[in-house]
Amino acid sequence: MDLTEKLGEKAAISGEKKAFFLTTGAEAVENCIKIARAKTGRPGIISFVGGWHGRTLMCMSLTGKVLPYKKNFGPMPGPVFHALFPAEELNVTEAQALHSLEMIFQADIDPSEVAAMIIEPVQGEGGFHQVTPSFAKSLRDICDEHGIVLIFDEVQCGFARTGTLFATEQLGVEPDLMTSAKSLAGGYPISAVIGRADIMDAPQVGGLGGTYSGNPLACVAALAVMEVIEEENLLERSIEIGDKIEAFLKGLNLSSIGHIRHKGAMLAFELIDSDGKPDVEATTNLKAKSFEQGLLLASCGMYGNAIRVMVPLTVEDEVLQEGLDIIKGILTA
């Protein structure tokens, strides 16, 4: 109950709220879909190109990226439809993204048959592209107009990673349901669905659950993480880390570094070739050589040429600089 109350206080959803605990981010997403369908009595789900929601069959269906996550694993559950995600780097405007939603309603499914719309406030696997407040408001308006449940998936971007406890706080828009996992308990397995009470209560009694749902040790770990975030000022530290990494990368002044995107300490930078095109080979090389020197890096993005930087918010400056120096040494060799 302590964790439920704490999340209820912090979640960017007004009114009466409830929380439900599971083990993995994918479970949280799956249960959001179950809740939304129970509330609306509708089957359809809309997600976004580049979105990442997990590795279960439903979550793979929601995910807007085929390789390596969906190929050879079908058929996928449906009906699920993918709208465009607006991002300057992807040459997709907000108007184009909203038009793609309208086309889904015209060509694929009537909005009266859509149960939920799910989006990451900051895309993870998709390349750390950020939802703007204006686009979030447009989605909120569309969902309100058609009685669609709006879900914000904060499994990767939540819990201080972006400089606020939830990235949702920076959008000025409230979802109906939201997910949390990963950093929720500092890597200990626990996830959560947080949402409006009237929607959370929609499934029949016993319809939601799990063997390890809300296990005491995981809940205590999550409460401890929330204490550390407050006591060590990790929201401010997140912003400081992101700004420092961005300044470092820009200071290298390398033509091979393309777009740099960050919200707090959630940062990604693209590697490009001399023609300005995605350089997957250079990205793979950077990951491999960094690993040889003791630094783990992960790639992301629709073209696989972005490096995601997700350092612990408790990282010491000396350790952070050591990692940055490894990146510099490889990119400038």
Predicted ranges, named:
Residues M1-A333:
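Conserved N-terminal phosphate-binding loop of PLP-dependent enzymes in the Aspartate aminotransferase
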